[in-house]
Amino acid sequence: VADLRADVRLTEQTEWDRFDPASPEGVLAGRRREHLARAPRSGTLPVAVPTETGSGSRRPSSTQEVFGRVLVGLSRHEQVGRYLVTTAPDVATSTNLAGFINRTGVFAPQPRRAWNVDPVLSWAEGPEGQHLELGISEMNLFLLLGQLGLAWDISDQPLLPVGTVYDPFVLRGLDALVYSVYSGARFIVAGTPSGVTLAPEGGAHQSTITASVGLELPGLTLLEPAYGTALDWLLCDALSRIATGPTPTTTAVPAESGAYYLRLSTRPIDQAPFEQARARLSDAVLRRQVLSGAYRLLDAWTAFPALRAAQDGGTAVPVVHLAASGPVLPEVLQAAHELAEDGVAGHVVDVTSLDRLYAAWQRTLRQGVRTATVPSVPGALRVAFGPRAPVVTVHDASSHAMAWLGSALGVPAVSLGVDAFGQSGTVGDLYRAHDLEPGAIVNAAMAALGLAG
């Protein structure tokens, strides 16, 4: 290396100097520099995404159904609608994108004749379309979402990309998903339907470990709401964060980088419990807690006055927290009522984002480790759970995805979930097989209380 340096008449002090601008090599390098130079590109989309579309319903509805309605509502928004792009690997209608497709059309370089005979679906293909339909290739889905999510950097055109896929098949495209998230792409993917709640279709279509993937993959934020309005808030908030771009953070845990994973369901559930929590907490407080990752759906002291009266009268009423995500909330609420009949106060916590709760917990742990101080309980956990009490976690996913909550709260925990391949049957059949029914939840609560002594 020293000989080469001497041959080209350089020294250690000058070997990285630029060429003489007047020399042939300097002129060539200057031309290439000018050709390749570009102004810094902003990753910010100059639109204000609404905080909600009002697509939630008071009647029983599923999160997949509301997801489709929220996208239709956003497509009507003058500023936001033109930047929305959807894509799916041959499952557009079965993941509830039909309404959006009817409004925006399907992209094709040239107009194509529509051969579709579905009377409720307008499959109009042309250059103005905003939906990209793929064949059955989940790998291509995540590769495309990755490129759409980097369009602001590649072509100076920020977009709001949304993809849908059957939840178990998230794993088919996992390598491309990891690469896209690692590259900093900003997008939303909805895995729907999910879990054994998709009961009739059997184990091949029932996802169990996807929640763990969403929780553990850096740069991807898992969201799993149970109620329509909560989904509306979370989806609009995610799109707003994508439009704004990553913001700097000084905390021990990195800021969300802009990739979001919605785990949804086709199970219609009663929306009344959410509306009751809304009346108890107010819209502003409830929305803040939903976006933070968890809120108290049912407060046992409020819902069961006899328990409060007994507690105030000096009787020690056992207390347990029932934490759950997604479509199992009706069973958890029923278990809380059965526990109340046995004199146990069961507070029901709806966990809308395990990811955000876990990140908050890890942030406090790491700050404690780095400063040699005792970590505190994160605010989001403290607000949703309140004073310490044993916890039962219930999840239509692997039981280990929520099992860490006991450690975070510093209490005994019993975790219920799906730790075996599913079978075909009714939702009730599958919930019984995996201990997700109210009776099993009650027994788990008693076990947790027993562990607490």
Question: Where do the model's predicted regions map?
Answer:
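Thiamine diphosphate
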Residues: 1-453, ...
